[in-house]
Design a protein with these regions (language model features):
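Membrane-embedded alpha-helical segments of multi-pass membrane proteins
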Residues: 32-52, 92-105, 154-163, 205-212, ...
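Hydrophobic transmembrane alpha-helices and their immediate junctions
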Residues: 333-376
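Alpha-helical transmembrane segments of multi-pass inner-membrane proteins
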Residues: 19, 23-24, 100-103, 108, ...
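Hydrophobic alpha-helical membrane-interfacial segments at the cytosolic entry of transmembrane helices
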Residues: 65-72, 119-130, 185-190, 224-245
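Transmembrane alpha-helices of multi-pass inner-membrane enzymes
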Residues: 43-44, 371-420
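Long extracytoplasmic/lumenal interhelical loops at the membrane interface
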Residues: 265-276, 287, 291-334
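A membrane-periplasm/extracellular boundary helix in multi-pass inner-membrane enzymes
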Residues: 197, 218-264, 282-287, 295
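Transmembrane signal-anchor hairpin modules in multi-pass inner-membrane enzymes, especially those
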Residues: 1-79, 86, 100, 106-122, ...
């Protein structure tokens, strides 16, 4: 196997490493920090590509598939908004972040050295710790933990994801030193604390998914039954421990209370409002399946739907902000094009990670497992909230899957025994 192609100078290598180290923490600590990190990383990636870091190698099938998936959002929005005669630039903001992931992947697959990818060992736990620090500094512990620019749902989602990326990153590229292992464990604990304080129930649903991914990647055929039993036991233990934590107990109890009130005709609860908005979205999708209602169409439909009694005034007010489901949001706004886009950005990267998850090269296999956690994690988060309506979360998702896919498939890159 040929050694990886190094960046054209040491400055580029250092900048790449610094960006990868800092971007998860900047998501929580600096308004605009995540977007700024991605823009700089994308610009540097383009410079590396123009400098010939790929040495004119042809694109591989996986790279082409990734590029098509990441560009599908811009194409979908363009087609639908042309149909609706509304091409306001703001509609393309989040989708543009996905496109920026393409040069990042292409450059890092060939220009990423061991030093560059080694930064990820620290990035994810530091990001989780930064989330806890941001909540503590801003003293927003009253009801739901949040920051001045990240609401409690997105905060909890990102924190729980970084917690498990920290945990699964233990002994990523070899046997970790004790300080590095303690850092990763601290990141895991910090992420869990923020998730509990945020009381974001959608993030908790992803925990069994993360565990299942890890077990699948380490599954050996002759131990199938033992693995299934261990998974069931792990879920049971986590469930029992979680039930003893008051905020979790309270939020889980509210699910049954909300559903009971909804059946009794009291629709303006947390779950009741979501059910109303999902019903409204499905109604509009049935009426406009091909081109959707346009980027602003769902918000505009809220008042008329409230006036005819399909949804309550409170649901209409909240629906002007979001649909509370990423898949329904993209489908109701952009029709089958939006549905294709959101499925592509979830499951094409997931498939590419899945192919690498049982690689004989541990660093690449662990990178792939973590990538599977990111893609399926965002899929689960997006069942109950829009995840890509915020540009910073769209940037975080697209940057992270690009970086992890580069680490999982990097040309000739089989780093070993970092962290010693």
């Amino acid at each position: 196997m040929k050694p990886p192609i190094k960046p054209y100078n040491i400055a580029a290598e250092n900048i790449l490493g610094a960006l990868l180290l800092a971007y998860p923490a900047l998501l929580f600590l600096v308004r605009g920090g995540m977007n700024g990190s991605m823009f700089v990383l994308a610009i540097l990636s383009v410079m590396l590509l123009l400098a010939g870091c790929r040495k004119h190698l042809p694109l591989q099938a996986g790279e082409i598939a990734f590029a098509l998936a990441m560009s599908s959002g811009l194409v979908a929005i363009l087609i639908v908004q042309i149909y609706h005669h509304d091409l306001a630039a703001r509609y393309f903001d989040s989708a543009a972040r996905f496109l920026l992931a393409v040069p990042i992947l292409l450059a890092l697959r060939h220009a990423g050295t061991e030093k560059v990818f080694h930064a990820l060992q620290y990035a994810f736990p530091l990001g989780a710790i930064a989330a806890l620090l941001a909540v503590w500094v801003e003293n927003r512990w009253h009801a739901y933990a949040q920051t001045s620019f990240l609401n409690h749902i997105h905060l909890g989602d990102m924190a729980i994801l970084l917690a498990f990326l920290s945990l699964f990153g233990i002994n990523w590229t070899g046997r970790d030193s004790l300080p590095l292992k303690l850092l990763k464990i601290s990141g895991f604990v910090a992420g869990l604390i923020v998730s509990v304080l945020s009381q974001a129930r959608g993030s908790w649903i992803a925990i069994p998914i993360f565990i299942a991914i890890y077990i699948y990647a380490h599954l050996q055929t002759k131990y199938v039954m033992r693995t299934v039993l261990l998974f069931a036991l792990a879920v049971l233990v986590i469930g029992l421990v979680s039930w003893s934590i008051e905020p979790i107990q309270l939020r889980i109890g509210m699910i049954f209370s909300d559903l009971s009130q909804f059946r009794a005709g009291h629709a303006d609860t947390s779950i009741g409002i979501r059910l109303q908005l999902w019903g409204a979205a499905l109604h509009l999708i049935a009426e406009n399946p091909f081109f959707g209602v346009g980027a602003g169409g769902f918000a505009e439909a809220m008042q008329p739907m409230s006036e005819v009694g399909r949804i309550t005034p409170l649901a209409a007010e909240l629906g002007r902000g979001e649909v509370h489901s990423e898949i329904l949001a993209q489908t109701v706004r952009f029709g089958i094009f939006g549905l294709g886009f959101v499925m592509a950005v979830y499951f094409i990267p997931f498939y590419l990670f899945l192919r690498q998850a049982k690689s004989v090269h541990r660093p690449q296999a662990i990178s792939a497992i973590m990538g599977m956690c990111v893609t399926l994690g965002f899929f689960v988060f997006g069942l109950t909230v829009e995840t890509f309506d915020l540009k910073m979360t769209a940037a975080f998702y697209s940057t992270t899957i690009a970086v992890l896919l580069a680490a999982a498939t990097a040309a000739g890159n089989h780093p070993n025994r970092h962290g010693k």
